[in-house]
């Protein structure tokens, strides 16, 4: 090392003797501290192998040892660029041991134009050849050979000269672990980071490799070098250079994707070159392969689900002939057509499927046997509620108006062999939706058929619901104590519908019972428990509750009350929950006897209070971990429901076809009866609405503008007044204040307790809106033979009655050349000179028509009567 230093010193002194350059002084740490330092210390910088740069190539830098190359000429120090500098410990690796002051100073030297100050013919300093030159030459400050440093020191080796404010350049040599970048860095512009070839470093060091030139303050790397040849590697190793030595774990060439593209230009290059390929739509973003939608969806929501801009969706819809905005609502069919253009499929789901609540994980060890849920179904008046009454030993049937079940009743009965939960569904034809819900939440269906009546429409409907829900059916043939009972006939009729009894080689269990006389009830219960045992019904009582809303109503004293069938888990007082589109916290719970309870387990029907609305019957019920989450889900469902209702309303009012265009061309042709329905429970209001809407005809439409549970209030009256509607109260009434307001506004309120009374009276009201049917009967015709002109009276037609008779009270029609010229009434009818009431065929008469004188010989006068017949709804 001393030989190297001596050789460099002699070279520099020889240059000074030539007198062509000022003396170049290279000082080490520890020299005169009074000398100011014009250049900052080189910053340590972690670098990585760079990518190809878009900059134009520059000439390669000559290697040390090459002959015939000119040195870099350094100007003399000026006032603003002193020749001497001191490397401050704070800037040049503080903590580095100071060097001994020696003779490492050289005077200015004059190199031949083809020589570089880095090169000497007998120099042992060898570096690999960089492929491209570094930045342009610039005025340099004092540099020099700094030598090697120990671990923790700054860059060592020959750094070369730097301009004011520049980072370290030149050859830095090797460093120990923890040191900054080493290797040949080359020259850099002012304010730049480390550049040039840095070589390899030990563990913990920054990245090595050839960094090349960078722009001012650029963090990016420069041009990429060509691979180092094996000859250069051998040459470097033979002369003691560690530039090409490999580090452990870094002997593989980095792939393009692993490189550090931190510079501005290279970052842009990376984004353009390595952008991932996606299935894209108009907006250049990925479109999912499948999305889920409700029956109606907002344009903005559709765009969000498809990862498209709203403008793209609106543009597509405009091409499809639909003028929409981001807030407009379209149906799922239209959305599916649009999505198909992007290769996206649409799956239509229900409101509750769109907002799925994440299932809680179950532990199979926690599952226990649960009671069966049994739904009693059948035709109206076949004895379903009486059967349940007998089982419960209570008088439930007496509380129902007209002896007909108005809504689902849920009860739990304790038998000798265990608990059974019963659901009693209505048998009236209006309660189709209730029976369908009952079949979906049940485990077993007991089909009650009267032995003296037979299979009826609601019996067949109940069979269809049970089969659709894949629920086993047990048949109870009731009223076998009556003289007209014929159980064999019932079994034959049911066998024709797929319910063949076990006695006849089938799989359906039959029980012959009499609910009134308590005959065969025990056998029926035994059959139910046997079927439940075969089904092996289980539930986990240790998880959060999950169930179904059986019924809901608005109670004056307790607010919204919902009957919930817990299907899994346990519901406790204080639990937050989501019930349909509403949320709440369990304030109180009651069993089917009205007693307060603290918790309800699987297959238990409980009445729950604390809901912020009246949910729909059949809606899902889910206990939640916290109330905030429950409210969020509720808000999403309410918004989706609003969109769905708005879309449905838009669809019904705008769909006009060629077939019905003539019916709607005149607004007066369509008559409408508007009603508001208020009932004690939500299910009854829903059933009444469904029944009344079936009464609509092309001429008279029934429009239920609002339906719900609860008492009739002032708001209902004001809505009815504004829309000219009738209010129907089912098991509810209005208070005196509301009644007075209704009288003032001229709103009619009708009260009912039995559903078929509602249907019958509304049907009569709608029939009154129908245009009566007019039947025309031609009673006689007469031909005009002569015309008599009377100045004071007008023209009189002399006619011969050809058929029938002409009556003075009849309507007449004047027909000429097959065209009706006039229709009206007779003003006078004379036989010779006498006024008569009618003239029969074969006689002549004189006819004067009120308001018509343009008679012509040969025209026909036709007399007819019109019979008005009141029409009925079909």
Curated annotation (Swiss-Prot):
GO CC annotations on file: cytosol
Start and end residues of each stretch annotated as G5: 514-516
Binding site for GTP: 378-385, 424-428, 478-481
Biased composition (Polar residues): 235-244
InterPro entries: EF-G-like_DII (IPR053905), EFTu-like_2 (IPR004161), IF2_II (IPR044145), IF2_N (IPR006847), P-loop_NTPase (IPR027417), Small_GTP-bd (IPR005225), T_Tr_GTP-bd_dom (IPR000795), TF_IF2_bacterial-like (IPR000178)
One function term, GO molecular function aspect: GTP binding
Region named G2: 403-407
Protein's UniProt name: Translation initiation factor IF-2
Species this protein is from: Leptospira interrogans serogroup Icterohaemorrhagiae serovar copenhageni (strain Fiocruz L1-130)
Gene giving rise to this polypeptide: infB
């Amino acid at each position: 090392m001393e030989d190297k230093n001596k050789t460099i010193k002699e070279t520099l002194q020889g240059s000074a003797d030539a007198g062509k350059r000022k003396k170049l002084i290279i000082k080490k740490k520890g020299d005169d501290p009074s000398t100011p330092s014009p250049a900052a210390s080189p910053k340590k910088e972690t670098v990585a192998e760079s990518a190809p740069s878009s900059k134009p190539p520059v000439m390669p830098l000559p290697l040390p040892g090459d002959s015939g190359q000119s040195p870099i000429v350094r100007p003399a120090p000026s006032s603003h660029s002193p020749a001497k500098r001191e490397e401050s410990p704070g800037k040049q690796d503080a903590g580095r041991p100071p060097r001994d002051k020696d003779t490492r100073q050289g005077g200015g030297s004059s190199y031949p134009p083809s020589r570089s100050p880095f090169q000497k013919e007998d120099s042992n300093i060898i570096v690999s050849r960089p492929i491209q030159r570094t930045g342009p030459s610039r005025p340099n400050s004092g540099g020099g050979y700094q030598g090697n440093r120990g671990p923790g020191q700054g860059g060592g080796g020959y750094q070369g000269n730097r301009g004011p404010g520049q980072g370290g350049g030149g050859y830095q040599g090797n460093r120990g672990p923890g040191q900054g970048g080493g290797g040949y860095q080359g020259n850099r512009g002012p304010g730049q980071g480390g550049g040039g070839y840095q070589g390899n470093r030990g563990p913990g060091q920054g990245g090595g490799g050839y960094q090349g030139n960078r722009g001012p303050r650029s963090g990016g790397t420069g041009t990429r070098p060509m691979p180092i040849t094996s000859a250069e590697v051998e040459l470097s190793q033979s002369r003691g250079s560690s530039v090409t030595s490999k580090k452990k774990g870094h002997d593989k060439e980095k792939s393009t994707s692993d490189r550090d593209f931190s510079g501005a230009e290279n970052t842009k290059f990376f984004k353009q070159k390595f952008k991932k390929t996606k299935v894209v739509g108009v907006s250049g973003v990925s479109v999912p392969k499948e999305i889920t939608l409700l029956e109606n969806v907002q344009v903005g929501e559709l765009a969000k689900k498809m990862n498209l801009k709203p403008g793209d969706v609106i543009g597509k819809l405009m091409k499809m002939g639909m003028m929409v905005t981001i807030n407009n609502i379209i149906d799922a069919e239209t959305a599916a057509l649009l999505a198909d253009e992007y290769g996206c499929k649409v799956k239509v789901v229900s409101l509750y499927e769109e907002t799925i609540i994440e299932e809680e994980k179950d532990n199979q060890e926690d599952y226990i046997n649960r009671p069966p849920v049994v739904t009693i179904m059948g035709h109206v008046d076949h004895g379903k509620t009486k059967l349940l009454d007998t089982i419960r030993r209570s008088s439930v049937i007496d509380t129902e108006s007209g002896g007909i079940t108005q809504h689902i009743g849920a009860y739990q009965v304790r038998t000798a062999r265990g608990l059974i939960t019963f659901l009693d569904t209505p048998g009236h034809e209006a309660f189709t939706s209730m029976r369908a819900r009952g079949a979906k939440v049940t485990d077993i269906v007991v089909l009650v058929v009267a032995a003296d009546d037979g299979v009826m429409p609601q019996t067949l409907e109940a069979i269809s619901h049970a089969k659709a829900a894949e629920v086993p059916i047990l048949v109870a043939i009731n009223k076998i104590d009556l003289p007209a009972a014929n159980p064999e006939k019932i079994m034959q009729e049911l066998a024709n519908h797929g319910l063949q009894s076990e006695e006849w080689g089938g799989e359906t269990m039959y029980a012959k019972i009499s609910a009134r006389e308590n005959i065969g009830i025990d056998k029926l219960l035994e059959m139910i428990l046997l079927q439940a045992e075969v089904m092996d019904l289980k539930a986990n009582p240790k998880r959060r509750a999950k169930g179904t809303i059986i019924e809901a109503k608005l109670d004056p004293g307790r607010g919204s009350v919902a009957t919930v069938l817990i299907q899994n888990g346990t519901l406790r007082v204080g639990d937050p929950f989501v019930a349909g589109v509403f949320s709440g916290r369990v304030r109180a719970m009651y069993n089917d006897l009205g007693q307060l309870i603290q918790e309800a387990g699987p297959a238990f029907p409980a009445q729950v209070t604390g809901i912020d609305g009246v949910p729909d019957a059949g809606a899902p019920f889910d206990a939640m971990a916290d109330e905030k989450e429950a409210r969020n889900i509720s808000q999403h469902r309410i918004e989706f429901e609003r969109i769905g209702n708005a879309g449905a309303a838009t669809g019904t009012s705008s769909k006009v076809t060629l077939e019905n265009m003539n019916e709607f061309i005149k607004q007066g042709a369509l008559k409408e009866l508007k009603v508001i329905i208020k009932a004690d429970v939500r299910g009854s209001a829903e059933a009444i609405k469904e029944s009344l809407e079936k009464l609509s005809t092309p001429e008279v439409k029934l429009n239920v503008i609002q339906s719900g549970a609860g008492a009739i209030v002032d708001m209902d009256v004001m809505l009815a007044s504004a829309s000219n509607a009738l209010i129907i109260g089912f098991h509810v009434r209005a208070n005196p204040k509301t009644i007075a307001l209704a009288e003032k506004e001229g709103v009619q309120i009708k009260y009912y307790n039995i559903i078929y009374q509602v249907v019958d009276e509304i049907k009569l009201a709608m029939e009154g809106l129908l245009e009566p049917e007019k039947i025309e009967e031609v009673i006689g015709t007469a031909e005009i033979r002569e015309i008599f002109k009377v100045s004071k009276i007008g023209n009189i037609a002399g006619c011969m009655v050809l058929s029938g008779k002409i009556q003075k009270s009849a309507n007449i029609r004047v027909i000429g050349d097959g065209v009706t010229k006039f229709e009206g009434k007779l003003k006078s009818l004379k036989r010779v000179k006498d006024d008569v009431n009618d003239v029969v065929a074969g006689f002549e008469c004189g006819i004067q028509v009120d308001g018509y004188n343009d008679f012509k010989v040969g025209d026909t006068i036709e007399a007819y009567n019109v019979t008005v017949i009141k029409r009925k709804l079909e």
